[in-house]
Amino acid sequence: MNTNQNDENIEKQPSQRGLKNRHIQLIAIAGTIGTGLFLGAGKSIHLTGPSIIFVYLIIGALMYILLRAIGEMLYQDPSQHSFLNFVSRYMGAKPGYFIQWSYLLVVVFVAMAELIAIGTYINFWLPDLPIWMTEVFVLVLLTLLNTLNPKFFGETEFWFGMIKIVAIIGLILTAIILIFSHYHTGTDTVSLTNITKGFEFFPNGVSSFFESFQMVMFAFVSMEFIGMTAAETDNPRPTLKKAINQIPIRIVLFYIGALLAIMSIYQWRDIPADKSPFVTIFQLIGIKWAAALVNFVVLTSAASALNSALFSITRNLYSLSQLNDDKILKPFTKFSKAGVPVNALLFTSLLILFTPFISMIPAISNSFVFITSVATNLFLVVYLMTLITYLKYRKSKDFDPSGFTLPAAHIFIPLAIAGFVLIFISLFCFKDTIIPAIGSVIWVLIFGLFTFFRKIKTAD
């Protein structure tokens, strides 16, 4: 399939290209900044000290290689609503069916988890309001938003992303001011030497260092969401190329910058593992409502993740209905006048609507934590299959050497595959992750066998 044919496919798309360059740039930024940075940075620092910076750089490099691979395939054919469509194209209908349904269910569980988190964050201000009511209200609101032209989704994500950026830049600027004023925290003077003083690469042992890889890996989950926006992006090729190329500097600025800021203000051993460093530091400079401020930031972060999940699941469901000739999926091919696969969106919202029931029943809620952990592990399976698909693409007639090609792909792709495999294997080495890891393997085996023996009807 050549570039001219793909350009014709772009014009024939029933969706509307309402996402502009600034939307995609902020979506890319928001995708690299998870809620975990605001709430979990203290725990990850406590686990392995300043060497956590190297862990973030390594995982960031793996994710950048993945996104360059996705970006190259989408650059060649930006008419695709989901980067997972390439699995069906280059690896076959059955692997495509397996990975798209797996990813769809994974993101449904992630969306449910984010909705539960939103209810909890709002409960911080409205403790007397039942959480289930909050969850239903937010879900209905975001569903209505997603029925509009994609530009409204882009605009919402733009401002959600801006809030996270302002919070991180505020933290970094605070650290710079405190460093130059030689501020004393009560235990020590704010200085970059707090990071290097008594530096040990493995302060809590090698096992803690490798355990931190899992935490950091799941902080980066959902960065691949940008691969769902190509078909609805105005002028997608240069826009996606620019957004993906800027990811490394964003990782350095927002993640590494925030970690350096936190560890320069407090010696890392003094940073509480169970409290947000953002709250601690903003309280230090006299912001009494620091807890409320950070709660607002993580609320918008969770709302952004849920909003993106609705968009992602809807487009994946539409893509499945396009690729497979199952009658049960046909209703999901319908687009509204606003250019939205509306039936797929409503079905997605109905699935997520089970969340309030999960919140209200403790036995189910406890089981759901396990299911969500299993689902999150499956992201690694998705990433691995995407990279293998990319290798198939490079050997196909569709490969465009003049496109957005990944330099030295023959070196970087095997390295990324090895990295993700090692992280997945490490899940079996720690008591907190071994059971969910076994659960994810069981899913791969059972659903994989089901897919293997099932007759997949592909659409023409």
Swiss-Prot record:
Instruction: Tell me the GO BP annotations in alphabetical order.
Output: amino acid transport; transmembrane transport
> Which family is this sequence assigned to?
Belongs to the amino acid-polyamine-organocation (APC) superfamily. Amino acid transporter (AAT) (TC 2.A.3.1) family.
State the compartments where it is located: Cell membrane
Q: Its principal location?
A: membrane
Query: What sections of the protein cross the membrane?
Result: 26-46, 47-67, 98-118, 124-144, 160-180, 209-229, 246-266, 278-298, 344-364, 368-388, 410-430, 433-453
Q: How does it sit in the membrane?
A: Multi-pass membrane protein
**Origin species:** Lactococcus lactis subsp. cremoris (strain MG1363)
Q: Which GO terms describe its cellular component?
A: plasma membrane
What the record says about disrupting the gene is: Deletion mutant is only marginally affected in medium that contains only free amino acids as a source of amino acids. Mutant shows almost no change in serine and L-threonine uptake, but shows a strong decrease in L-alanine uptake. SerP1/serP2 double mutant is completely devoid of uptake activity of either L-serine, L-threonine or L-alanine.
Q: Name one Pfam family in it.
A: AA_permease
Could you list this entry's UniProt keywords, alphabetically sorted. Amino-acid transport, Cell membrane, Membrane, Transmembrane, Transmembrane helix, Transport
InterPro entries in the record: AA-permease/SLC12A_dom (IPR004841), Amino_acid_permease_CS (IPR004840)
What is this protein's name? DL-alanine permease SerP2
Signal peptide span per the entry? none
Q: What does this protein do?
A: Transports DL-alanine, DL-serine and glycine. The preferred substrate is DL-alanine. L-serine is a low-affinity substrate.
